[in-house]
Amino acid sequence: MEERTLVILGATGSIGTQTLDVLKKVKGIRLIGISFHSNLELAFKIVKEFNVKNVAITGDVEFEDSSINVWKGSHSIEEMLEALKPDITMVAVSGFSGLRAVLASLEHSKRVCLANKESLVCGGFLVKKKLKEKGTELIPVDSEHSAIFQVMEPEVEKVVLTASGGALRDWKISKIDRARPEDVLKHPVWNMGARITVDSATMVNKAFEVLEAMELFELPFEKIEVKIHREGLVHGAVVLPDGNVKMVVSPPDMRIPISYALFYPRRVALEPFFLRTISLSFEDPDPEKYPAFFLLKEIKDSYALRTAFNAADEVAVEAFLKGRIRFGGIHRVIEKTLEEFQGYPQPRTLDDVERIHFEAIKKAERVTEWLSSTSY
């Protein structure tokens, strides 16, 4: 079988490094390029171990190796992808900057493995337009969307996304407001980056995933349900018209959906999972415990509000992790920022989306400053 070429965007992050783990175990894909932001030490290690000859740097660091092709700056990812035109691009870039990375990947790759949430949340209309133009394969990497991708049928009654409930799922509502960063970062199931772990505790990440599912599977909001599933074994399910439910059950290991996206439709051998005596529980999220999640109904039909929601969360989570606001302040920053964007016109271009994002960042920062000054 001919080797396919791969570029990993965000190679030094959580999904990026787990993608590298898969490549060590399974043959058939050759890594030809990576991007990273600032983790120079790990980037050097990856380049050496995988004999990578192409590197895009989005941060302000120097990569000194005359044998490597290096692209730097805000357009480094687009320029590298245009030069390499890989068979597969793994978009593991986190944050809003992932939108540009996804669009460039769709332009220059045959398959895009999508592990960036913001691209569909904020720019789903742009991603779908590019998909239609280029005919690129788009395969989700998030465990929930990978699960739905695997069991989806032409007619479904409901799609069910599962959630862990985050580190505070068993806390009393009266105490959640004052949870510390070290409390919130103790995720009960997954080992993830700091922001997504906080987003799990607020269930903002699940709000993102509902919006992603609407875009990926062209589903109406009403057909998507979210259930808190403590065991972390069921990643997604579809309820069929005849009463059957199809679900994907596997250990909480991101290498499974990563390998599925890379090698689809072939399944590669990882570690087998054997059925045993287990119980599976499913609960509805509590609006009092997860108020930010329940803002979904307000934002679902507006890319402007969705973009503002994401930007406000980005600012609020950073402020919480730095000890500037309480955990309960995250929801308040998001809610107050959204108030400023009610009735805002729908974006039509990438520039429109980026303008809304940066406006929302500024507004959220002002709200955060106010909350910080009130010791909230």
UniProtKB/Swiss-Prot annotation:
Its EC number is 1.1.1.267. GO terms for molecular function: 1-deoxy-D-xylulose-5-phosphate reductoisomerase activity; manganese ion binding; NADPH binding. The keyword Oxidoreductase applies. Its cofactor is Mg(2+); Mn(2+). It holds the Pfam family DXPR_C. Gene3D superfamilies: 1.10.1740.10, NAD(P)-binding Rossmann-like Domain. 1-deoxy-D-xylulose 5-phosphate binds at K117, S143, E144, S164, H187, S200, N205, K206, E209. Coiled coil: none annotated. GO terms for biological process: isopentenyl diphosphate biosynthetic process, methylerythritol 4-phosphate pathway involved in terpenoid biosynthetic process. Pathway: Isoprenoid biosynthesis; isopentenyl diphosphate biosynthesis via DXP pathway; isopentenyl diphosphate from 1-deoxy-D-xylulose 5-phosphate: step 1/6. Keywords: Isoprene biosynthesis, Manganese, Metal-binding, NADP, Oxidoreductase. It is an enzyme of class 1 (oxidoreductase). NADPH binds at T12, G13, S14, I15, N39, N116, E118, G193. It comes from the Bacteria. It catalyses: 2-C-methyl-D-erythritol 4-phosphate + NADP(+) = 1-deoxy-D-xylulose 5-phosphate + NADPH + H(+). Mn(2+) binds at D142, E144, E209. Transmembrane segments: none annotated. Belongs to the DXR family. Catalyzes the NADPH-dependent rearrangement and reduction of 1-deoxy-D-xylulose-5-phosphate (DXP) to 2-C-methyl-D-erythritol 4-phosphate (MEP). This is 1-deoxy-D-xylulose 5-phosphate reductoisomerase. It comes from Thermotoga maritima (strain ATCC 43589 / DSM 3109 / JCM 10099 / NBRC 100826 / MSB8).
